[in-house]
Amino acid sequence: SLAQPDAKALPLLFAADAARDLGATRVLLAAPYLAYLRQDRRFNTGEAITSRTFAALVSTVFDGIVTVDPHLHRYRSLGEVYRVPTRVVQSAPAIAAWVAAHVDRPVLIGPDAESEQWVQEVARLAGAPFTVLQKIRRGDKDVGVSLPDTAALAERQPVLIDDIVPIACEEIFKRVEAS
């Protein structure tokens, strides 16, 4: 995964370049999480649009990319930013099957409005209700969350659906500490 990418990006590019230098005819990237896609516009004066910058760099050393459920807020496809073939794997069917098989009376919870598309699809496939929390993002690492009407969640097992597991875990720990 390319979560927390600053420490991983250059070693990844070096490894791809070394593979080609050592004789690889094709070098493909399989990354469950593609970094920097959230920065798809300038949110503050002087910021880089890192989704485009990172895509340009990756496209110079890899011949193709496979990823899972990328953040495509203002892009319609990865092809808008990557110059190599891309393939997106949808996680909803596997997650829904697991929830349906292992959780009694689930209610799926998305941490923010951006997660609604995934949560709604997992809920549909699992035959479960869902709700989405309201996230207030004040900065890259400064985020607040408001809980929905908890009466609708009574008698159900909550299942948090998030595309970035560390963020989901952080939210869970915050809720446990608050209760």
Each language-model region and where it sits:
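PRPP-associated nucleotide enzymes
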Residues: 1-179
